[in-house]
Amino acid sequence: MLNLCHALRGVRQFSCSVIVKVKCASCSIKLQDQDPSKPGYYTKPKSLPDSKLNPDLQDLKYLLFSQDIQLSKQAIQNDPDLKTKRDLLLRVICKRCSNALHHNNYNPEEFPESTLNDILNYVPRGSNVMHIVPFVEFPLHLDPNVLKRNDLDTTLVLTKSDQVFKDKNAVSKKVPIFMKQFLKNTLRIDSNKTFAISALKNWNISMFYNYFKNYTYLLGNPNVGKSTLINTLLQKYLGYKVKIDSTGKINSPSEEVMQEAFTNPKNFFKIQAAGVSHIPNLTRSVQAYQVGGKILFDLPGYSTSTSRLRLEELIDERWLQRLRKTDLFNRKHIKQKTYESMKGTSQGGCYTVGGIFYLVPPKGSINQIVKYIPGPSKTFKNIEKGIDVFNSCNSSSGTHPLSRYCGIKSVICEKSQYKRYAIPPFIGSIEIVLKDIGYILLRTTGRYEFKGLHEIWIPRGIQVGIREPLENLIESGYQRYIETNGKESSCPRDRPIISSLYEMAPDEADTLNAVKKSYLEKTEKDLSARRFVDDDPYDLVQHLEKKKNPYWYYQW
């Protein structure tokens, strides 16, 4: 741990000689006070703390002054020992994180995205890696490039499973069987190393701990649940941060650190906890943790594209926090599955949550929608009406009667700023998944009759896909697998169960034929995935009971 006797010896004014030995407790970057344009910077206060204070405590007071951390007088005056100084230092966060977390001053340029290759520079060849994927948004976030690497020993960890399943029985027993067969059938990856967990509900955490090896790296996109998982492990196994020197050597934890875990566990965890935030790309450096007898590394999140538009530029800050804060998810939707009804109209009636998307059912169809995305929903006569209303909401400073339904910013002010996607044909129910946002269940009711394709309009830059309803898919597959003693696959082999959507021109009238054309283009280099290519599209959709999920194809 940090040697404060050495770090603070003879220091009367705050300087880099102190702070260089301290990392930001939120993003793990080294702290400095020399260059405002560089990461880890502190803003000097206009006046120094009371010079009558002990010199060492004066430095600590300075550290905490710039980020509004409250210190009790008792801690300053009556407990001036090295342990207190160390604890106070370990709570410090940099100006960037302080502004974003405590002052709602968020500058996306200060939170740059990283690529997979950027992050893999932190990971030695042959390392143990946990690929962290939020199950709630499956298959989005799943990166075959990580699972297929021969230079890493990779395990797939599916987080946030409580947002998909009612209880942990399916998570423990059924998901691993399903995923093993899904990976083999879909990606030709032969692996039985899959865990489904919920850090918030403590589902499978003990099993996960027993499985992962010493010196394991957590790898995934931003906001997939890495830090929440780490904090659950820290609490359960009295874990703590450890430091790495310039040679990569991990310093052994001190007896003093371990003693505090028993004497003051609440304060101990507060200091050691990983920085959990709704803000993406908060972590900027590797942070090592001692969890029981194992070392675990938290890596910064990586993005598959550094050019996509950020959600922070599109979605209202309060709505975005609700979308990203896992602990705010209402599980009653999982248990009750309360639906909203909507009938497709000739005017293009649409369903939206905050203007983040517009779902347009075909004329005459009767639909049920179960919403797993926070925020109130609203229907409009057509997309143009919805966009017009939300423009009025943004210009009214919250006084518009429909302002509570508006979750987007004024930058999305025209229909041209949305992409039009056609959903390939389906029968029954599907789940529409929006990356970093959530999903909705869409169900067509009544006797099947093809009335046209469903459409969804989404702001440019948001990734979307569909899947068969995940919970039902895994439950029914497991039942089939057990009844046949494993002879039949838990994951269907007769049809694709996930698909990308097909972008359409705004004025495209024959969307079904346009979907087939796009399907043939996407599968040009994957001929084995093609199905029903010789069928006439309009004949094909009359027989979906026998020819399920035509033109479904997921582009990894």
Curated annotation (Swiss-Prot):
One of its GO terms (molecular function) is GTP binding. GO terms for cellular component: mitochondrion. The keyword Disulfide bond does not apply. Keywords: Mitochondrion, Transit peptide. Residues 1-21 form a transit peptide. It is found in: Mitochondrion. Residues 113-305 form the CP-type G domain. SUPFAM superfamilies: P-loop containing nucleoside triphosphate hydrolases (SSF52540). It comes from the Eukaryota. Coiled coil: none annotated. Pfam families: MMR_HSR1 (PF01926). Transmembrane segments: none annotated. The keyword Transit peptide applies. Belongs to the TRAFAC class YlqF/YawG GTPase family. GEP3 subfamily. PANTHER family: GENETIC INTERACTOR OF PROHIBITINS 3, MITOCHONDRIAL (PTHR46434:SF1). Interacts genetically with prohibitins and thus may be involved in the mitochondrial lipid metabolism. This is Genetic interactor of prohibitins 3, mitochondrial. It comes from Saccharomyces cerevisiae (strain YJM789) (Baker's yeast). The gene is GEP3.
